[in-house]
Swiss-Prot record:
Gene3D superfamilies: 3.10.50.40. Residues 20-108 form the PPIase FKBP-type domain. Belongs to the FKBP-type PPIase family. FKBP1 subfamily. One of its GO terms (cellular component) is cytoplasm. It catalyses: [protein]-peptidylproline (omega=180) = [protein]-peptidylproline (omega=0). It comes from Cryptococcus neoformans var. neoformans serotype D (strain JEC21 / ATCC MYA-565). This is FK506-binding protein 1. Keywords: Cytoplasm, Isomerase, Rotamase. Transmembrane segments: none annotated. It is an enzyme of class 5 (isomerase).
Length: 108
């Protein structure tokens, strides 16, 4: 249970966000069957959030700090690190494992 980081392409390997940092990220969120439920890329606007402060799901709070600037990776988040038994109706069913393709664009 938790979050698994699967590297797609390397970042700079030395600049990592710290808890409390604001980050700018592009992401595509899918269910394990490939159904897309959200995408900053489709909106054409990167997502900005503060990491490690409960503003996003736990999988992001723990997974994003493992990425360096420019890195693209999949974050596989088990339900307890995503939306849990509640899900996010009507888009995300209860107890769903989620896959986010994320790209860390910058630390603000």
């Amino acid at each position: 249970m938790g979050v698994t980081v699967e590297n797609i392409s390397a970042g700079d390997g030395k600049t990592f966000p710290q808890p409390g940092d604001s980050v700018t990220i592009h992401y595509v969120g899918t269910l394990l069957d490939g159904s897309k439920f959200d995408s900053s890329r489709d909106r054409g606007t990167p997502f900005v959030c503060r990491i490690g402060q409960g503003q996003v799901i736990r999988g992001w709070d723990e997974g994003v700090p493992q990425l360096s600037i420019g890195q693209k990776a999949n974050l596989i988040c088990t339900p307890d690190y995503a939306y849990g038994a509640r899900g996010f109706p009507p888009v995300i069913p209860p107890n769903s494992t989620l896959k986010f393709e994320v790209e860390l664009l910058k630390i603000n």
